[in-house]
Swiss-Prot record:
Main EC class the enzyme belongs to: hydrolase
Protein name in UniProt: Glucosamine-6-phosphate deaminase
Catalytic activity from the UniProt record: alpha-D-glucosamine 6-phosphate + H2O = beta-D-fructose 6-phosphate + NH4(+)
Entry keyword set: Carbohydrate metabolism, Hydrolase
GO cellular component, one term: cytoplasm
Active site: 62 (proton acceptor), 128 (for ring-opening step), 130 (proton acceptor), 135 (for ring-opening step)
Domain of life: Bacteria
Family in the record: Belongs to the glucosamine/galactosamine-6-phosphate isomerase family. NagB subfamily.
Amino acid sequence: MKIIRVQDQIEGGKIAFTLLKDSLAKGAKTLGLATGSSPISFYQEMVKSRLDFSDLTSINLDEYVGLSVESDQSYDYFMRQNLFNAKPFKKNYLPNGLATDVEAEAKRYDQIIAEHPIDFQVLGIGRNGHIGFNEPGTSFEEETHVVDLQESTIEANSRFFTSIDDVPKQAISMGIASIMKSKMIVLLAFGQEKADAIKGMVFGPITEDLPASILQKHDHVIVIVDEAAASQLD
């Protein structure tokens, strides 16, 4: 695991984009993408660039259960607004949050991941150490699955909704085993509220109580953090 410290989120996005360009030059064809505030500066760099992504495939980590793609809080909407509308890909995959059978949808998504091995996976990290929507206690062997979101995650995401009561209580998420199959992982974390999770991920025991700790076992992980998020690493 390599740690890169940056001044702020803007610099973090630039460095992540440089890593992406290197990966594309080596033949990367499938990107694993994340939502939330952490990757936004990275997506801004992609949008500003002259690179053409029309031969690439993207696979997103997760989607809320119960939100249509037209909901402005769906991750499908987020990705279109922040990246896909400006930079079309050959194919974009996200879980279907309105699937009538969400368990079958999870299995369908695993098949997509199997058919499109991820070359470059972007991650954020939750305050409780979750990656994707893999909450503490999630088995490291889990593949795509339906998640009951923890109260801390619902609270953290409530800032994007009119009311905390409007935050979906479930999501479909790529599993930890799925994430670990990615050839390269770039995790972005900014802000003091991520410091405890980053410390546990880097130095703590590998435990399902802190899902991101499994990344210690991955061969190619780069963690991009600002000084606040890195404040407990010294």
